[in-house]
């Protein structure tokens, strides 16, 4: 199972290197990694997606806490949270199919950020499922390049379960 970990760290040089080293020494893979400033100026939030069972993630969490600059580690996999990812995708789009590519981007509430004679570059923001869905739809046109930020997430203070909300949407 894939787990989403939110790690607060002191914003100092070498912190990310130590965390990556910990994963490498233990043979763990990081599938997604996003780092940025947190709510306090001297603290950064690292959001990572890692595969593993409950015992593995518990062991990994304990190991992370042993690192000097780690403030807090939270497995937010089962916690209601807001998840987002940013993706840029460059798609083949010549004159005959350009309108269809642009229309598809609009359906996904994506933005066209560049157009050339042969390509359209699309900016997509949303949950990881949206990224997969639009890539599947764009594949028939020919995907030239993809750049993704990796997932970022914050716990929902409301405690509302997003999956529950999605199930309600499908009923209306």
From Swiss-Prot:
Pfam families attached to this UniProt entry: ACT_AHAS_ss (PF22629), ALS_ss_C (PF10369)
Enzyme Commission code(s) on record: 2.2.1.6
Catalytic activity of the protein: 2 pyruvate + H(+) = (2S)-2-acetolactate + CO2
UniProt enzyme class: transferase
UniProt entry tagged with the keyword DNA damage: no
Keyword vocabulary terms for this entry: Amino-acid biosynthesis, Branched-chain amino acid biosynthesis, Transferase
Signal peptide span: none
Biological process (GO), any one: L-valine biosynthetic process
An example Gene Ontology molecular-function term: acetolactate synthase regulator activity
Xref: PROSITE patterns: ACT
SUPFAM superfamilies: ACT-like
Residue stretches making up the ACT domain: 4-78
Pathway note: Amino-acid biosynthesis; L-isoleucine biosynthesis; L-isoleucine from 2-oxobutanoate: step 1/4; Amino-acid biosynthesis; L-valine biosynthesis; L-valine from pyruvate: step 1/4
PANTHER family: ACETOLACTATE SYNTHASE SMALL SUBUNIT (PTHR30239), ACETOLACTATE SYNTHASE SMALL SUBUNIT 1, CHLOROPLASTIC (PTHR30239:SF0)
Family to which the UniProt record says this protein belongs: Belongs to the acetolactate synthase small subunit family.
Identification of the protein by name: Acetolactate synthase small subunit
Organism: Synechocystis sp. (strain ATCC 27184 / PCC 6803 / Kazusa)
